[in-house]
Amino acid sequence: MRECISVHVGQAGVQIGNACWELFCLEHGIQADGTFDAQASKINDDDSFTTFFSETGNGKHVPRAVMIDLEPTVVDEVRAGTYRQLFHPEQLITGKEDAANNYARGHYTVGKESIDLVLDRIRKLTDACSGLQGFLIFHSFGGGTGSGFTSLLMERLSLDYGKKSKLEFAIYPAPQVSTAVVEPYNSILTTHTTLEHSDCAFMVDNEAIYDICRRNLDIERPTYTNLNRLISQIVSSITASLRFDGALNVDLTEFQTNLVPYPRIHFPLVTYAPIISAEKAYHEQLSVAEITSSCFEPNSQMVKCDPRHGKYMACCMLYRGDVVPKDVNVAIAAIKTKRTIQFVDWCPTGFKVGINYQPPTVVPGGDLAKVQRAVCMLSNTTAIAEAWARLDHKFDLMYAKRAFVHWYVGEGMEEGEFSEAREDLAALEKDYEEVGTDSFEEENEGEEF
């Protein structure tokens, strides 16, 4: 079996984890106490779901996951929530004091106390796997635990499980809405530290998701629950091919092979369609062609940036539900004829397709409509560099005045780490710029000298 272990770090990671496991349980017909739902037993003809759940002797299914936070309140909600019997108590790990939005606390002082315990618990999970495929790590860039502790954990996972792939689902600080003033610092420090350890990072921007909730789902004031349920649909689509059998299945390593042209350029843009409320879905027929073309609309994206200004390097379309390859080919051919979508000239074809026959499941009482088919597009585009540029700019404004830096230095960090991280991100922006330039232009430049 090809097992995946999910690691949920910090408040964002744990709350997204709640939404994801709730959805996974519904999709696989597993009840809140981990037993099979008698009515839903027909869903699980295949046992692919064991990539995400392990089965105990008495027929209980336990998620292969750990939830970690340096302060207890968020994980306590899981311990007392509907799914408290689903998780093994040792899978829920909490510290006593939080990282206080401070990368240095998560990475150096407070994080150091918990890291060995966490790795020990992860080791127990990996020992129960017959063929571990890799780790999915959920966290935010802006928080102290999400940024600091995650980067520490990634470094240690690289040491212990060198060749196993590590995919991140990261919550990127929104351009307008901010939960902490020091988000730019934390984000840049964590990106710098995890850049060499992460194989692929799917970024999700809260503001983009707020907008989707307002615009497509008619929720006036979206809560984190609304956001997380939408994010969990995306995570479910990306991991569906690992949990169900399908016509064109996609493996974790296959994502990287098809999406990451250079090791550092591993931040695909995620788009999901159809995102539609139940009232609207009742009156619309969402064909394969329609959902495919709406994937290329900037307002279905999970990060605010404009791919019409960038170039695509690779594109992965993951369909689920009532979809046949013929429709997909027609839809993609139609996309290719549109001139708005530019591919880099060194990667002419660039579409990888996965089809999974399990239709999307929705959480009862949730916001999304039950639809017959859905698509999740992962595209590696140079436009995502806009997101880095925005963050870097905010970082520069604060760092020029050395604002808030003493909090980091006070926790044992050196000031040099800030400039080192900033230079690394400047290099990342440059990498994106160079990847997007046409190869024939470079050949001409060489002749002038």
Swiss-Prot record:
Its cofactor is Mg(2+). Keywords: Cytoplasm, Cytoskeleton, GTP-binding, Hydrolase, Magnesium, Metal-binding, Microtubule, Nucleotide-binding. GO terms for cellular component: acrosomal vesicle; cytoplasm; microtubule; microtubule cytoskeleton. GTP binds at residues 11, 71, 140, 144-145, 179, 206, 228. It catalyses: GTP + H2O = GDP + phosphate + H(+). Its EC number is 3.6.5.-. One of its GO terms (biological process) is spermatid development. It is found in: Cytoplasm, Cytoskeleton. Preferentially expressed in heart, skeletal muscle and testis. Expressed at low levels in the developing brain. Expressed in megakaryocytes and platelets. A motif (MREC motif) lies at residues 1-4. Some glutamate residues at the C-terminus are polyglutamylated, resulting in polyglutamate chains on the gamma-carboxyl group. Polyglutamylation plays a key role in microtubule severing by spastin (SPAST). SPAST preferentially recognizes and acts on microtubules decorated with short polyglutamate tails: severing activity by SPAST increases as the number of glutamates per tubulin rises from one to eight, but decreases beyond this glutamylation threshold. Glutamylation is also involved in cilia motility. The keyword Nucleotide-binding applies. It is an enzyme of class 3 (hydrolase). The active site is at residue 254. Mg(2+) binds at residue 71. Its main location: cytoplasm. Tubulin is the major constituent of microtubules, a cylinder consisting of laterally associated linear protofilaments composed of alpha- and beta-tubulin heterodimers. Microtubules grow by the addition of GTP-tubulin dimers to the microtubule end, where a stabilizing cap forms. Below the cap, tubulin dimers are in GDP-bound state, owing to GTPase activity of alpha-tubulin. PANTHER family: TUBULIN. This tubulin does not have a C-terminal tyrosine; however, its C-terminal phenylalanine residue can be cleaved. Dimer of alpha and beta chains. A typical microtubule is a hollow water-filled tube with an outer diameter of 25 nm and an inner diameter of 15 nM. Alpha-beta heterodimers associate head-to-tail to form protofilaments running lengthwise along the microtubule wall with the beta-tubulin subunit facing the microtubule plus end conferring a structural polarity. Microtubules usually have 13 protofilaments but different protofilament numbers can be found in some organisms and specialized cells. It is linked to Macrothrombocytopenia, isolated, 2, autosomal dominant: A congenital blood disorder characterized by increased platelet size and decreased number of circulating platelets. Affected individuals usually are asymptomatic and do not have increased bleeding episodes. This is Tubulin alpha-8 chain. It comes from Homo sapiens.
